[in-house]
């Protein structure tokens, strides 16, 4: 059975999914990016299944190599963008924790509101 056309098509689909994920990450559409991840994983599994059945010829491997490089480049860029987002979220969580600690420590002062006042002298 010659699955070369099917394998090539599967790789093209993976490239499209990879480009979509990069676009979503670039546009900071994080929910959509996460939602698209399963389709990407399924496409990778489909390729793995196809290559288990029959190893691609040397010619086919040469044709697929540029696609693989593009996918790996896209994946690297997505990871960089995700790391930036994770750093932003960690900073926000840290700020929130500090704010919560301050409110917990100084928020309940026996019914008095602590606020700066003008000097009365």
From Swiss-Prot:
Region annotated Required for homodimerization, chain positions: 1-50
HAMAP family named in the record: FliT
Subunit details: Homodimer. Interacts with FliD and FlhC.
Ranges that cross the membrane: none
Function, in words: Dual-function protein that regulates the transcription of class 2 flagellar operons and that also acts as an export chaperone for the filament-capping protein FliD. As a transcriptional regulator, acts as an anti-FlhDC factor; it directly binds FlhC, thus inhibiting the binding of the FlhC/FlhD complex to class 2 promoters, resulting in decreased expression of class 2 flagellar operons. As a chaperone, effects FliD transition to the membrane by preventing its premature polymerization, and by directing it to the export apparatus.
GO cellular component: cytosol
Single biological process term from Gene Ontology: protein folding
Highest taxon of source: Bacteria
UniProt name for this protein: Flagellar protein FliT
Subcellular localization(s) per the UniProt record: Cytoplasm, Cytosol
Assigned keywords, A-Z: Bacterial flagellum biogenesis, Chaperone, Cytoplasm, Repressor, Transcription, Transcription regulation
Chain residue ranges for the region called FliD binding: 60-98
Homology family: Belongs to the FliT family.
């Amino acid at each position: 059975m010659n699955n070369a056309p099917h394998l090539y098509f599967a790789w093209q689909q993976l490239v499209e999914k990879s480009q979509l994920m990069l676009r979503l990450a670039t546009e900071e559409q994080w929910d959509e990016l996460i939602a698209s991840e399963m389709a990407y994983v399924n496409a990778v599994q489909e390729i793995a299944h196809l290559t288990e059945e029959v190893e691609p010829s040397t010619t086919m491997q040469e044709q697929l190599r540029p696609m693989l490089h593009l996918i790996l480049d896209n994946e690297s860029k997505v990871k960089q963008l995700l790391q930036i987002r994770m750093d932003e979220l960690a900073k926000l969580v840290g700020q929130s924790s500090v704010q919560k600690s301050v409110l917990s420590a100084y928020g309940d002062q026996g019914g008095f509101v602590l606020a700066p006042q003008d000097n009365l002298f």
